[in-house]
């Protein structure tokens, strides 16, 4: 039996990050966490490209554009969708998650889901660097592991 796992090491890998502008005060913290994780694990600034999109709904199309450009070994998607008083939240969350999964499966590169889907602003703040950690950091660590794992599998 062979067990294959990704390690937290990457050399000469380029990462694309897609960040939503809507809820930017939270998403900027997610981005900061992601950049911190990448840099702590040896990724150089010139190996990172960041694309800002208007909102979470626009993340998949730019993730797809990046993924199919053959420039990146992983795409990190960051955004925040907070439940409001209408069903808009459910539609956005469902379509963004499906879109990101679709991009990953069709491009054959890791496209990491770092979109917070929360009931309220307090939950979003907690997940962007306070009591519940920083999901941007966690997703970037996952991206590094996935790049290494994909390389090992070939």
Swiss-Prot record:
Q: What does this protein do?
A: Catalyzes the formation of 6,7-dimethyl-8-ribityllumazine by condensation of 5-amino-6-(D-ribitylamino)uracil with 3,4-dihydroxy-2-butanone 4-phosphate. This is the penultimate step in the biosynthesis of riboflavin.
The protein's matches in Gene3D superfamilies, at most eight in alphabetical order, are given as: Lumazine/riboflavin synthase
Name assigned to this protein: 6,7-dimethyl-8-ribityllumazine synthase
Residues binding 5-amino-6-(D-ribitylamino)uracil are 22, 56-58, 80-82, 113
Q: Which reaction does it catalyse?
A: (2S)-2-hydroxy-3-oxobutyl phosphate + 5-amino-6-(D-ribitylamino)uracil = 6,7-dimethyl-8-(1-D-ribityl)lumazine + phosphate + 2 H2O + H(+)
Q: Which GO terms describe its biological process?
A: riboflavin biosynthetic process
SUPFAM superfamilies the UniProt entry points to: Lumazine synthase
Q: Would I find Glycoprotein among this entry's keywords?
A: no
Which of this chain's residues are annotated to bind (2S)-2-hydroxy-3-oxobutyl phosphate? 85-86, 127
Which is one Pfam family of this protein?
Answer: DMRL_synthase
What EC number(s) is this enzyme filed under?
2.5.1.78
The entry's family comment says: Belongs to the DMRL synthase family.
Q: Spell out the catalytic residues.
A: 88
The record ties this protein, via CDD domains, to:
Lumazine_synthase-I
């Amino acid at each position: 039996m062979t067990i294959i796992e990704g390690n937290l090491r990457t050399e000469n890998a380029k990462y694309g990050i897609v960040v939503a502008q809507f809820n930017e005060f939270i998403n900027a913290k997610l981005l900061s966490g992601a950049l911190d994780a990448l840099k702590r694990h040896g990724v150089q600034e010139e190996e990172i490209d960041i694309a800002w999109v208007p909102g979470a709904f626009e993340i998949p199309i730019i993730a797809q554009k990046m993924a199919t450009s053959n420039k990146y070994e992983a795409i990190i998607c960051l955004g925040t969708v907070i439940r409001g008083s209408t069903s808009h939240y459910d539609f956005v969350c469902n379509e963004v998650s499906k879109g990101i999964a679709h991009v990953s499966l069709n491009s054959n590169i890791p496209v990491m889901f770092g979109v917070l889907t929360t009931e309220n602003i307090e939950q979003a703040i907690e997940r962007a660097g306070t009591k519940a950690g920083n999901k941007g950091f966690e997703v970037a660590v996952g991206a590094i592991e996935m790049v290494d794992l994909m390389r090992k599998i070939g």
